[in-house]
C-alpha cells in the first residue's frame, strides 16, 4: 500500500494538470508556431515556466486504484499487476483468465 499522502499528492497533481491544460497548450502552440515572433515566443516560454511545476502532465504518475502502487500498472484495468491477478483469480474480470498452453 502506498502512503495516503502519496495518493493525495497524485490527486492534487491530476487537478492541477486539468486546471492548467488549456493554458499550457496555448503557450506551447505559440512557442512551436513558426509565425510567432521571437518576442512572443520568449514571452510564452517565460509564462510557461511561471506555471506550477505539477501542472505538467508528464509529472503525473499512474497508480493502482486499489493500492496506489506506482509500478506494474496496467492502464486498461486501472490496477497493478498484483491486484489484477487477484481479481482475475476470483473471476471478477470478464473475459480474463489464467493462461495455459
From Swiss-Prot:
InterPro entries: Ribosomal_uS14, Ribosomal_uS14_bac/plastid, Ribosomal_uS14_CS. Pfam families: Ribosomal_S14. Gene3D superfamilies: 1.10.287.1480. Keywords: Ribonucleoprotein, Ribosomal protein, RNA-binding, rRNA-binding. GO terms for cellular component: cytoplasm; small ribosomal subunit. GO terms for molecular function: rRNA binding; structural constituent of ribosome. SUPFAM superfamilies: Glucocorticoid receptor-like (DNA-binding domain) (SSF57716). One of its GO terms (biological process) is translation. Part of the 30S ribosomal subunit. Contacts proteins S3 and S10. Belongs to the universal ribosomal protein uS14 family. Binds 16S rRNA, required for the assembly of 30S particles and may also be responsible for determining the conformation of the 16S rRNA at the A site. This is Small ribosomal subunit protein uS14. It comes from Shewanella sp. (strain W3-18-1).
Amino acid at each position: 500500500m502506498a502512503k495516503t499522502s502519496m495518493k493525495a499528492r497524485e490527486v492534487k497533481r491530476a487537478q492541477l494538470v486539468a486546471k492548467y491544460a488549456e493554458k499550457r497548450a496555448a503557450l506551447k502552440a505559440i512557442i512551436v508556431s513558426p509565425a510567432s515572433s521571437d518576442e512572443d515566443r520568449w514571452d510564452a516560454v517565460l509564462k510557461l515556466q511561471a506555471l506550477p511545476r505539477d501542472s505538467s502532465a508528464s509529472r503525473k504518475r499512474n497508480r493502482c486504484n486499489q493500492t496506489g502502487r506506482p509500478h506494474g500498472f496496467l492502464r486498461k484495468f486501472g490496477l497493478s499487476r498484483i491486484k489484477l491477478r487477484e481479481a482475475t483469480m476470483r473471476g471478477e474480470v470478464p473475459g480474463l483468465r489464467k493462461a495455459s498452453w
